[in-house]
């Protein structure tokens, strides 16, 4: 059973004792947590019958562990003013149908680490902009993510400028229709393995890898893909270092289509490996 508790580790306040953390509830109201100099650890019991919609932190928080019922506002960031490590433990997300923009940057784009194994995603149908502009995160562990109900992954990782590794090998994408801009502007990624992706229902891959300027190797093995240029416009735009695309097990129509797309996106010297 979810305990509705938030634990905080706080660094040096540098003499500023007028600091508070606010937990806002979906049903209305909030819990205000005073943060005092010298007190480094906090364990706050939240209201048992309410769902968190927003967590407004302070820059001095080094770690937050959330074990609570969550129902964030669709299309709005769940957490603000936070630049430490965020961990979810046994959270109740049963009232959520989407996680659109849940960790989107903006006020808290300096967040450095996310631990998501306690975040249940089995009922989620949309993850568009979920990690958009998480600019300081270098790695995201998604090994626990259940994506079998997801239909929308538009801009899911867009503008994750510092992201160096991304393992999506466990993603079930058989229901996904929109991958527009999914990895756009992930400028530190050097390789990406999407060989497990089922793209049979996808109707939009526009700008999917746009400005992945350091991407060198892309694995699309097993893809069955036949979108028009309009629906895959600028899919590889700005991938200036892309040299190798693995397409093992792909039919010739898919191979020809991918070649046409990257040629239209003004890429040169890309090698297709089929065996």
Question: Where are the predicted features?
Answer:
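N-terminal targeting peptides
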Residues: 4-47, 51-54
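Acidic, Ser/Thr
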Residues: 104
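Small-residue (G/S/T/A) turn/hinge positions that recur once per unit in extracellular repeat modules
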Residues: 50, 77, 97-98, 235
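Structural signature of tandem-repeat unit edges
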Residues: 33, 37-71, 82-97, 108-125, ...
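Short, aromatic/basic amphipathic alpha-helical patches
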Residues: 233-234, 254-266
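Register-specific detector for alpha-helical tandem repeat solenoids, activating on a conserved position
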Residues: 100-101, 128-129, 154-155, 180-181, ...
């Amino acid at each position: 059973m979810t305990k509705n508790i938030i634990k905080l580790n706080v660094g040096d306040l540098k003499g500023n004792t007028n600091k508070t953390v606010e937990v806002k509830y979906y049903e209305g109201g909030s819990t205000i947590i005073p943060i005092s100099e010298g007190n480094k650890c906090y364990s706050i019991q939240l209201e048992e019958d309410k769902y968190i919609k927003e967590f407004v932190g302070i820059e001095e928080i080094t770690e937050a562990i959330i074990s609570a019922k969550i129902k964030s506002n669709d299309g709005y960031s769940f957490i603000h003013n936070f630049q430490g490590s965020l961990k979810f433990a046994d959270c109740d997300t049963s009232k959520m149908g989407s996680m659109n923009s849940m960790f989107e940057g903006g006020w808290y784009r300096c967040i450095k680490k996310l631990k998501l194994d306690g975040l249940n995603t089995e009922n989620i149908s949309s993850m568009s902009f979920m990690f958009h502009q998480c600019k300081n995160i270098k790695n995201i562990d998604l090994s626990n993510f259940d994506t079998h109900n997801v239909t929308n992954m538009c801009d899911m990782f867009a503008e994750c400028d510092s992201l160096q590794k991304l393992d999506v090998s466990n993603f079930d994408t058989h229901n996904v229709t929109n991958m527009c801009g999914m990895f756009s502007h992930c400028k530190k990624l050097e390789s990406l393995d999407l060989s497990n992706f089922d793209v049979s229902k996808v109707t939009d891959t526009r700008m999917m890898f746009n400005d992945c300027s350091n991407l060198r190797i892309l694995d699309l093995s097993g893809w069955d893909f036949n979108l028009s240029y309009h629906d895959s416009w600028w899919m590889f735009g700005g991938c200036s270092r892309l040299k190798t695309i693995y397409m093992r097990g792909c039919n010739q129509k898919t191979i020809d289509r991918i070649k046409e797309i990257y040629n239209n996106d003004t890429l040169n010297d890309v090698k297709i490996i089929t065996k």
